[in-house]
Amino acid sequence: MSDVEENNFEGRESRSQSKSPTGTPARVKSESRSGSRSPSRVSKHSESHSRSRSKSRSRSRRHSHRRYTRSRSHSHRRRSRSRSYTPEYRRRRSRSHSPMSNRRRHTGSRANPDPNTCLGVFGLSLYTTERDLREVFSRYGPLSGVNVVYDQRTGRSRGFAFVYFERIDDSKEAMERANGMELDGRRIRVDYSITKRAHTPTPGIYMGRPTHSGGGGGGGGGGGGGGGGGGGRRRDSYYDRGYDRGYDRYEDYDYRRRSPSPYYSRYRSRSRSRSYSPRRY
C-alpha cells in the first residue's frame, strides 16, 4: 500500500471517529427528548381521564339526587293524598257550616216538647175540616186560630192540623183530654208543637211547576184559618215523575247532538282509526 492510500484511510477513520462522538449525543438527545415527552403525555392523559371520571361521577350523583328528591316528593304527595283521617276530623267535616245549623232552631225535643199554646193534631181523616176541629177544641178554651194543612196540588188534606189557643192552661187541658180521641172514624194524636209560633202554609208533596189549567192555593198562614185547595184537572203522571224541568227534553237532546263533549269526540276519533275497511274483491 502506498503512502497516499494510507493517509486517505487514516483520514476516513479519523472523520468517522470524530463524527461518532458528536453523533451519539444527538441520538441521546433525541432519546432523552422522546423519553421526557412521553411521561408528560401520559400524565396529561391520566389527569384528563380522572377529570372526566370525576365529572361523570358528580353528574351521576346529581342525577341520582334529583331522582331521589323527585321520588321523595311524589311519595310524599301520594301519602298526603291517601291520608287516613281520624274520627274527630271526620266529625268536624261532617258538621255543616250553615248559619241555621249553628243555632238551635227549636227548644225542647220531639219526644218531649215544652208546653205552649200551639197544639199539633195528627192522624186526621181527609174529610175533617177546620170547622170540625174548632167545634171540638173550643170546648177547652178560646181559640186564636185553626190551620189544616192541605196539599197544594191536589187540594186534599194531608192528615194533620194546628190549633192555636190564647192561654197555655187551655192548651194543656186540651192535650190531656183530646189526645187519643176518635174523630170522623180516626183516632187522633194531640201534642205540643215544637216551633211555638204560627205555621206558614207548607208546600205539600208536589214541588214542581204549577198546573197550566189553573188550580187552587194552599192552606192558611199565621193564626188564621187555612184556605182549601182549588180545582183544575190533574196533570199527567208523566209530569208528576219530574220530567218537566223548565225546558224541553228534545231541545236538550238537540243541543247535545250539536255540541258533543271532548271525551265523546276523542272516543269517536279513536274508534275510527281502529276500524278496518271491508275487503273488496
Swiss-Prot record:
<keyword id="KW-1017">Isopeptide bond</keyword>
<keyword id="KW-0507">mRNA processing</keyword>
<dbReference type="GO" id="GO:0005634">
    <property type="term" value="C:nucleus"/>
</dbReference>
<feature type="modified residue" description="Phosphoserine">
    <location>
        <position position="237"/>
    </location>
</feature>
<feature type="region of interest" description="Disordered">
    <location>
        <begin position="199"/>
        <end position="281"/>
    </location>
</feature>
<dbReference type="InterPro" id="IPR000504">
    <property type="entry name" value="RRM_dom"/>
</dbReference>
<comment type="similarity">
    <text>Belongs to the splicing factor SR family.</text>
</comment>
<feature type="cross-link" description="Glycyl lysine isopeptide (Lys-Gly) (interchain with G-Cter in SUMO2)">
    <location>
        <position position="196"/>
    </location>
</feature>
<keyword id="KW-0007">Acetylation</keyword>
<keyword id="KW-0694">RNA-binding</keyword>
<feature type="modified residue" description="Phosphoserine">
    <location>
        <position position="94"/>
    </location>
</feature>
<feature type="modified residue" description="Phosphoserine">
    <location>
        <position position="2"/>
    </location>
</feature>
<keyword id="KW-0597">Phosphoprotein</keyword>
<keyword id="KW-0832">Ubl conjugation</keyword>
<dbReference type="GO" id="GO:0003723">
    <property type="term" value="F:RNA binding"/>
</dbReference>
<feature type="modified residue" description="Omega-N-methylarginine">
    <location>
        <position position="233"/>
    </location>
</feature>
<dbReference type="GO" id="GO:0048026">
    <property type="term" value="P:positive regulation of mRNA splicing, via spliceosome"/>
</dbReference>
<feature type="compositionally biased region" description="Basic residues">
    <location>
        <begin position="267"/>
        <end position="281"/>
    </location>
</feature>
<dbReference type="InterPro" id="IPR012677">
    <property type="entry name" value="Nucleotide-bd_a/b_plait_sf"/>
</dbReference>
<feature type="modified residue" description="Phosphoserine">
    <location>
        <position position="84"/>
    </location>
</feature>
<dbReference type="Pfam" id="PF00076">
    <property type="entry name" value="RRM_1"/>
</dbReference>
<dbReference type="InterPro" id="IPR035979">
    <property type="entry name" value="RBD_domain_sf"/>
</dbReference>
<comment type="subunit">
    <text>Binds to A3 enhancer proteins SRp75, SRp55, SRp40 and SRp30. Interacts with ILDR1 (via C-terminus) and ILDR2.</text>
</comment>
<keyword id="KW-0508">mRNA splicing</keyword>
<feature type="modified residue" description="Phosphoserine">
    <location>
        <position position="80"/>
    </location>
</feature>
<feature type="compositionally biased region" description="Basic residues">
    <location>
        <begin position="90"/>
        <end position="108"/>
    </location>
</feature>
<feature type="modified residue" description="Phosphothreonine">
    <location>
        <position position="200"/>
    </location>
</feature>
<feature type="compositionally biased region" description="Gly residues">
    <location>
        <begin position="213"/>
        <end position="231"/>
    </location>
</feature>
<dbReference type="InterPro" id="IPR050441">
    <property type="entry name" value="RBM"/>
</dbReference>
<dbReference type="GO" id="GO:0006397">
    <property type="term" value="P:mRNA processing"/>
</dbReference>
<feature type="modified residue" description="Phosphoserine">
    <location>
        <position position="14"/>
    </location>
</feature>
<feature type="compositionally biased region" description="Basic residues">
    <location>
        <begin position="51"/>
        <end position="82"/>
    </location>
</feature>
<feature type="modified residue" description="Phosphoserine">
    <location>
        <position position="82"/>
    </location>
</feature>
<protein>
    <recommendedName>
        <fullName>Transformer-2 protein homolog alpha</fullName>
    </recommendedName>
</protein>
<feature type="modified residue" description="Phosphoserine">
    <location>
        <position position="96"/>
    </location>
</feature>
<feature type="modified residue" description="Phosphothreonine">
    <location>
        <position position="202"/>
    </location>
</feature>
<feature type="modified residue" description="N-acetylserine">
    <location>
        <position position="2"/>
    </location>
</feature>
<feature type="modified residue" description="Phosphothreonine">
    <location>
        <position position="24"/>
    </location>
</feature>
<keyword id="KW-0488">Methylation</keyword>
<comment type="function">
    <text>Sequence-specific RNA-binding protein which participates in the control of pre-mRNA splicing.</text>
</comment>
<feature type="region of interest" description="Linker">
    <location>
        <begin position="196"/>
        <end position="223"/>
    </location>
</feature>
<feature type="compositionally biased region" description="Basic and acidic residues">
    <location>
        <begin position="233"/>
        <end position="257"/>
    </location>
</feature>
